[in-house]
A protein has these predicted regions:
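Ribokinase/PfkB-type carbohydrate-kinase core domain
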Residues: 1-33, 48-56, 60-195
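Flexible glycine/proline-rich, aromatic-decorated loop/lid segments
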Residues: 34-38
Length: 195
């Protein structure tokens, strides 16, 4: 049986396609020194803000950190969060040509308020409705072009509407027809679309 180190060595150099729900994780760090007089809630003084890759983008970043070359495919809105996230992802070294900006959709944003090590609150923004057939087709065209240069596909489902049943089936077919493995990480309620 290979050791963990041997497994990591095998992972280095793999070329992955990651398709799924691209999320912008926003962290606001601060400190709490009092309770609000308006309601029994803490008042946090914001001191620092940080954006991180979330959802499928986090999966892609983790694979990149382990030594893989990663092509990310997903949807962001044509908004400031989408633009900031695409810049962040490109700066990390991910191939982001497959992260498509779409005017009809807001970027999925999860804002976490952190006081020290205490997670005070999370605010989620964005839509969870399934993407349109037009968006599915655009992602499939982008993914199809990447199949020859990728060794495997990871489907990363966070139930934000990108991995529709049709897109999951068609993306899987592209890689299976090329005799390349497909790895699925679905939300439990969505498992039937990946079987």
């Amino acid at each position: 049986m290979p050791t963990p180190h041997q497994l990591l060595e095998r992972f280095a150099g793999i070329k992955l396609a990651v398709l799924g729900d691209v999320i912008c994780d926003r962290f606001i760090y601060g400190d709490v020194q009092r309770i609000s007089p308006e309601a029994p809630v803490p008042v946090m003084r914001a001191q620092q803000e940080e954006l991180k890759a979330g959802g499928a983008a986090n999966v892609a970043h983790n694979a990149l950190t382990l030594g893989a070359s990663v092509h990310l495919f997903g949807i962001v809105g044509e908004d400031s969060w989408g633009e900031s996230l695409r810049k962040l992802l490109a700066g990390l070294g991910l191939h982001t040509e497959g992260v498509l900006p779409v005017a009809q959709r807001r970027t999925t944003l999860k804002t976490r308020l952190m006081a020290g090590s205490q997670h005070l609150l999370r605010v989620d923004e964005g839509v969870t409705e399934s993407i349109s057939a037009e968006m599915e087709n655009a992602l499939l065209a982008s993914l199809r072009a990447a199949v020859p240069s990728c060794d495997a596909l990871v489907l990363s489902d966070y139930d934000k509407g990108v991995l529709t049943p049709r897109l999951a089936v068609q993306a899987t077919k592209l890689f299976r027809d090329a005799e390349k493995p497909v790895i699925c990480d679905p939300k439990p309620a969505n498992i039937p679309r990946f079987v």
